[in-house]
Amino acid sequence: LQMNAAGDRLVVGAHQNDGSGTDAGHARAYSYNGSAWVQLGADIDGEAAGDNFGNNVSINDAGSRIAIGGQYNNGNGSEAGHVRIYDYSPDTDSWSQVQSDIDGEAAEDRSGFAVSLSASGDRVAISAILNDGTANNAGHVRIFDLKPAPDTVGPTMTITATDGSNAVADGATTNDNTLTVTFTSNEATTNF
């Protein structure tokens, strides 16, 4: 779960929810109206059984954009994983997907294990904890600048563990230019 900067919006993942299949997962967002937490829009369900959608979630400072990880999604190979980005429309009380799915690079990457939106929501960091880029299961974090649809989204930076330890975006994005990335036995702060 994660709360926005003002503390009046919250996104919660339930990765073993069975709404669209066993363990498909889902996420819900809530807004505090001064006396109670009220759901914003409908549940956002995972694509298929076993996706574990909602295993990690993030919300921008305004509470108008969320990122949801589904580390076991099979869109680009078995357990490649993916992340979906949604914007909230108060006019229709609904969430709509902003871009196409951001899929893991290869089978068993488990992309979406951790996700972190920047304060503005214009940048997202996505951890693929078992990506084999520099070593078997070394993991990496890809950072994407989100562009207005229908522009293509591509990574602007990839942070990898050179020693074989797993790279995890721990969600500690402090502003739009700094991200803390934790490796199994190390920690690094990167400016971009």
Predicted regions and their residues:
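Structural beta-strand segments of beta-rich domains
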Residues: N177-V181
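Short proline/glycine-enriched turn/loop motifs at strand-loop junctions of beta-rich domains
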Residues: S185-N191
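Extracellular/surface recognition and adhesion modules
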Residues: I44, I102, P155, I159, ...
